[in-house]
C-alpha cells in the first residue's frame, strides 16, 4: 500500500469526510480552496466546486510539482525544483482542517497533504518531500513514537509598518514595504 493509499484509508477519515459534507450543505458552501504551503511559506493550491468534495477527498487533485516552489524560475529561466516534463503531484485533503472562510461564506478551505503521482516510476504515491506541512506531521509522529512526547510548534508572527485605506485594508505603503526580510527594508 502506498503512502497516499494509507493516508486516504486512515481509521476514521471516512467519517470526517462525511462530516465535512454535512458542514458544506449546512453552511451553503459552493466552492473549496484546497491549500498547501510552498517551500517559501506561501499558501498555494487549487479551487474546486464543493459538489466534488467526496471524489476529491478520495482521489485528490493533481497540480504541477513546481507549485511547491511557487513556479519560480532560476537565473537560467528553468523552473526551480521540477522541470516542465515532470508529472503532477497529488493533493489529498485533510478533512479535519476544513472550515468556512469568514470573508466569503460561500467558500471553504481545507489543507492537503501532497504525494508523488500515482504513475511515477520511482516511489509512486509516496510522500512528496517538498510538502512542508506533510513533512512536519511525519516528523511529529516519528518524534512521538521514539520519545513518547508531543512535539510543540508555533508560529513566529512578523511585523511590518503599513498604513491603511479608509476601509481598513492595507495600502501597501507606509514606514516599510510589505516584504518581510527583503534587504531593501534595511535602507
Language-model segments: residues:
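Glycine-rich, acidic/polar active-site loops that bind/position phosphate-bearing ligands
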Residues: 1-187
